[in-house]
Regions:
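Bacterial N-terminal signal peptides that target proteins for export
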Residues: 1-9, 189-190
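Bacterial N-terminal signal peptides
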Residues: 9-17
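Generic detector of N-terminal low-structure segments
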Residues: 10, 115, 206-207
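Residue-level signal for beta-strand positions within conserved beta-sheet cores that form or flank
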Residues: 19, 88, 190
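Bacterial Sec-dependent signal peptides at the C-terminal "C-region" and cleavage site
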Residues: 19-23, 207
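Metal-centered catalytic cores of metalloenzymes
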Residues: 22-90, 94-185
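A short, hydrophobic C-terminal helix/tail in secreted or cell-surface proteins
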Residues: 188-206
Length: 210
């Protein structure tokens, strides 16, 4: 007769059942949307047809934003290439009236993310925003969301989860934005790893002879 040792069974169940509770980081990526403006998400990335109004320029990009709800930080990374104009600003807008479409005001740092490469047609950017600092926000966004950075963070992250926030890259050719991508949550790898470990434990000890 085979049995799973009680202590190991408890550990395995804990790993499977509580994995999501340990996830304090959420990774969002930019996704392209349909050019018709109906709000249909497409592949990861940023482009001109995703803009509102749309454009036919061939520039592309891809960005990620890693949110930590304990540290209250947003780690940003983006790469872009093939722009028609040179970059003039970049930031995240929120919240659009509906998911994956329409426009909204700037929520993050204005006039542009600190350190974002300006005057170029291709490049990369990486920086981490401290969401507890007023300098990470557009002052108008903070004022419209309770007057505190905490209120701004709560509503901004809700917009990210709701697909109502988009990363925009503005250029000399298209002042309103040459390429953009809506923020979309990616699967949680940390939770998946813990669940996998838990299931592996069950498999190993259920096959192990006494």
């Amino acid at each position: 007769m085979r049995s799973i040792p009680r202590a190991f069974a408890i550990v395995c169940v804990a790993l499977i059942c509580t994995a999501p509770a340990y996830s304090t980081q959420y990774l969002f990526e930019t996704v392209k949307v349909d050019a018709g403006g109906v709000g249909i998400p497409g592949l990861p990335g940023m482009d001109g047809p995703s803009e509102s109004p749309t454009n036919t320029f061939t520039g592309t990009g891809y960005g990620t934003a890693l949110y930590d709800d304990i540290a209250h930080t947003l780690a940003l990374n983006v790469s872009f290439a093939g722009l028609d104009g040179t970059t003039t600003a970049s930031h995240i807008h929120a919240a659009t009236p509906n998911p994956f479409r329409q426009t909204a005001g700037v929520a993050t740092t204005t006039p542009s993310f600190t350190g974002f490469p300006l005057g170029v047609k291709s490049g990369t950017f990486s920086n981490t925003l401290d969401l507890t600092l007023g300098t990470s926000w557009n002052p108008s966004y903070v004022s419209a969301h309770g007057g505190t950075t905490a209120g701004a963070e709560t509503d901004f992250i809700a917009a990210m989860f709701g697909h109502q926030a988009y990363w925009n890259i503005h250029t000399s050719t298209v002042g309103g934005g040459e390429i953009r991508g809506f923020m979309s949550l990616t699967p949680e790898p940390a939770s998946g790893v813990l669940i996998g470990i838990g299931l592996a434990c069950f498999g190993f000890f259920s096959r192990r002879p006494r």
